[in-house]
Amino acid sequence: MDTVGTDAAAASINERRFAQSTSPKVSVKSQDSLFLITYSNMQQTVVQASLADRYPSLKKLNILLYIDIPTIDYYNDEMTHNKLSRLNKRFKLHRLRNSIAQSFSNTSTAEDNDKFWEELKSLISSRSTPENKFDLNVLVSSSGSLRYVETIRFLVEKLFNSFKDLYVQKKLNLCFQINVSPTSLKWFSTFLNAELLNLKIINWQNIGSFTKTIQNSKSLPFKEYYTKLNEKFTGSNQSNGSMQDQTVLDSIVIVTNSTGVKALLTLLSDHPLTSLISQESIKALHEYSDAVNEDKGDDQSNTSLKRNSSSLLNFQNSVLTSNKDKSVRIRSLSINRKSNRAHMFKTNESITTIPSTSINNLIGQESNLRKQPSGTALHLQSHLHPHSRSQSYSSSNMSRSPSPFPYGKTPSNDELVYDELNNQINEVQDRAKNEEIVLYNNNNYDDYTKERGEQEQDRTSYADEYGFNYDDEEGGNEDNYDDDEDDDDDDDDDDESDDEGLSFYAPSILSRSGSSTDVLSSGIDSMAKNSKETRGRFRSLSLMDPALQKPFNQKFPNSQQPDSAGASSPKRSTSSNHFTNVYVHDGDFDGTDTINNKKNLSSATLIKRKSLMNRNLAPSISNGLIPPEFISRISTPSTSASSSNSSLNDMSTVSNAFSKLLNDTSKKQKFLNSPIPQHTQQASPLLMRNNSNSNLLFEKNLINKSFEELRRQPSVNLFSTLMNGNMEKNGLALNFKSRTPTDALMANSIKNSNNSSHRLLNLEEEDQIMSGSLPKEREDDNDSTNSTIVPNHPDNDNYNDNDNDNNTGINSNNFNLNLYDDNDSAGFTDVTTEGVKYSNSNSTVTKPVYKKAVTLDLYGEDDMDNMGGWVLGGNAR
């Protein structure tokens, strides 16, 4: 009886001891941008006891590992992506493998973890038999990515090596179930422990591509562990009773990112949070959340803006969410001109502009912003102050800020526009008491003066903690984290300093958004009334007119100046009749001119300055926009004296002037022999050469000179020679003769003519090729193109008759034209001049004409006489 009573008393004592144990809770740990979520019903007792004493009925242990990192899972293993190296650096799962192995036992230290596995092996060795084995099931659920194989291999081989002896003794049923893809399965079959593979205790679940699994399969890592945890958190399963009655232990380990943690908190939102998650984990989550918010706040307020796209876009995205990842970068060839940078001055601290209307409207709509500035407003305020080293446009540090020009020096040499800017700044300061923007600036300035010391301390501490260097503005920040190296590489191209150029980005809430409706006003009076609201220069880059909701209309009416000085000044013509989707305006929207308000300036100075402003603001097209490939001497050889274009133009001019005379022989001859008209005698400078008292203003008029000399040609019938006096042909056409009679004619004209008319006869060969010769002559030329010697057919009388009939009014002098100036040109000329004789009796003695082989003188080396001719490769001049 005493023994029975003693055993009952011992059992009651053990129940009270183990009843003081804590209930199962979820623990969360963060490491390397990843989170380790652990749930286990292995309860830790207040009084230390062995695993066999705590769980006398234990027969099964389930270890469930879920790897859910969507950033990695959605990339295929076979895909080569430029961000994979960055992902591998950020999500280094192999750094968590020791923590994952320790989480299987739900222990806090490595010593407790080793003690747990030793006690479990002792429990299996003492209780299990080949007939009654202990079950150890390990499930690894993931997307099967290659980025997980090293960690999975480490965990599986560690468990196998620990329980290999018990498995050989047939006291343990060891089973692994691993989700793999075809690529990761190939890797495991190659690099996993050969002994483990030969035992065939691993059940490979080939899920294929993870993207296909998302579409087709209902079993995903997130859904699986969500369901498991939900079952553990239900009320019926939460009261597991005494530990001595437990036969199965579950250990759920989840590796995920911040998205998975948010999903867990959403899952626990319907339950008392403190009863399901450990107090240490709640504290750790709060610290992590505060650190993230602090980093975001520091990025918005303390981090200086750099002259690169990523820094400015990050700042804009925090203010205006509609312009994310949209960077507009505009560079102009005329960016260095004074007219483009006259209305903006750059200091060492910031780029300052004149106050605009948008800030006034913003302040008027948000009155609470002036009374109690919010955190975002304070962050924006820190960017707008000069000490922030911002390279973006600032609009709130205008009226009360000191002069940005040190020692009276300006970045631009245009002192006129600088005086105008000073005048505008003085007028804005004079109207400070009547404008709302002054109140806003006063508040900001007071806050700035009070908090400047504190902000400098915060900036110093922030720089000391994170390694930022605010003095080096162009160098960029160097992070100590591995995952930011690729970000720096992406921004290297945009990190170059551009001292001369300016970069305009997508407009944010700080930029001035002007509208063409500000210009379209009913009259001068209304514009004068609204001058306080619309006065001030700005520069905006927008795609649409915010007021009209359509592309900007750049057609503005010319405002009439009320004073005499404005009326006497040149009219300003800046209107254009086209619409554009990019609107850049730099000028006053009101009709009044701030320069005219200065009474101490003379009208001449005002006119001079207004003309300078009109010239600067007038739209112009730069010649630099024309690519150099469109300016080529080969494509535009019209500057050459003997080019084909100039020759054809001269011939067309002559043909148009004497078209009627070419069709009537009698009128043509009468005109050529007629005296010089009286008005021509008075106007022509050629007739006044002997008069020393006359003023020869038009002595070099080539048009009059050419026509005077043309009318003084009594012997050479130019039109019957060059333009074919055969009336059967079209008189308006350039009906040039074939080469042989033309060469003879022109050679004779050059030798015997005493005047300067031979220059008009110096025609190129391509002008002769483009002539309207007879069809038979064209056939003869085509047939003899490839031959070296082309004999004139003496038996064919028609060939000679046609040539002679067409040259009835030509002198019998011999003409010679050396187009190529070759060595054999003399012999060729002798044969030609001797064989061809022209007379009024149409009798001709012909000899074989030796035609030169077709050659192409590309660079004009053989053409010594034609020094002004255009050849391939450039002008010879």
UniProtKB/Swiss-Prot annotation:
What residue spans carry the Polar residues bias annotation?
510-521, 551-579
Position of the Glycyl lysine isopeptide (Lys-Gly) (interchain with G-Cter in ubiquitin) cross-link: K668, K670
On this chain, the residues bearing Phosphoserine are S309, S310, S311, S332, S334, S692, S694, S706, S841
Compositional bias of kind Low complexity: 389-402, 805-815
* Entry keyword set: Coiled coil, Cytoplasm, Isopeptide bond, Phosphoprotein, Protein transport, Transport, Ubl conjugation
The protein's location, in the record's own words, is: Cytoplasm
- Which Gene Ontology cellular component annotation is one that this UniProt entry carries? cytoplasm
Q: Which GO terms describe its biological process?
A: protein transport
Compositionally biased spans, kind Basic and acidic residues: 447-462
Bias (Acidic residues) occurs at 470-501
Main site of residence?
cytoplasm
The role this protein plays is: Functions in the SND pathway, a SRP (signal recognition particle) and GET (guided entry of tail-anchored proteins) independent pathway for targeting a broad range of substrate proteins to the endoplasmic reticulum. SND functions in parallel to GET in targeting proteins with downstream hydrophobic motifs.
Note the subunit structure: Interacts with ENV10/SND2.
Q: What is this protein called?
A: SRP-independent targeting protein 1
Q: Which organism is it from?
A: Saccharomyces cerevisiae (strain ATCC 204508 / S288c)
